[in-house]
Amino acid sequence: MLIDIGVNLSNQQFKNRVADVLTRALSAGVEKIILTGTSISESRAAVALCDEYQSQFPNMLYATVGIHPHEANSWDTASYRSLKELASHSAVVAIGETGLDFNRNLSTPKEQEVAFEAQLELSTELQMPLFLHERDAAKRQLDILTHHRESISNAVIHCFTGDKKTLFSYLDLDLYIGITGWVCDERRGLELQKIIKNIPLNRLMVETDAPYLLPRNITPLPKNRRNEPAFLEYIVRCISEHREESEEVISKMTTATALKFFALD
């Protein structure tokens, strides 16, 4: 059994393909999937998918609800209430995707911090874990998280791609680490491959971030280059190789960690 903690199933690339994608995921041993909310509308779409496919795929889909740093300029006084209402749905297991992204600054750093801090407050009020994004903003994000750490119930750094120093800084805050197909990339993933063994197994979770970040150790690569949850096993395989631990151990431990972190059935 595997759990994919981050899938963008409401993405247009999956339109009219959701049932097939979920069927292939089950065939590949992926029994639970957490859909990522990145805006109010995408969070609603994620929750709607959980409802739509509950009868056909019982207790397989869950969701996060939040506003991604790219969308932070959409934050207003109604956003908090909207996310709180969405978070009351039984399938919602975390607040996010939230955090800071100073790589592209599609929203200004100030706008990002306002939305981030508000979602930290929401997670504290609801005592729900955080699903965090961070790109080229580790120092500021760590400062904010350190300030709020005592009130945060739990948090996972989704799609970690940072260096060893940043990894240890997050681990020092007792945060969890999500690993995607980035680790399978023979060009961009070399640093992550070297430090993956430094993540305690009980702090590690796996995710595809589908349809993005297709694992490059798939042979042959699918012609459409579209990632999906069924390919989670390739990420586990790569982690296994670089940690020098069996795929069975990686699968068992990451699943146990995700079940506990998200309080899944």
Ranges and model annotations:
Residues 1-265:
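Mid-domain alpha/beta scaffold segments of enzyme catalytic cores
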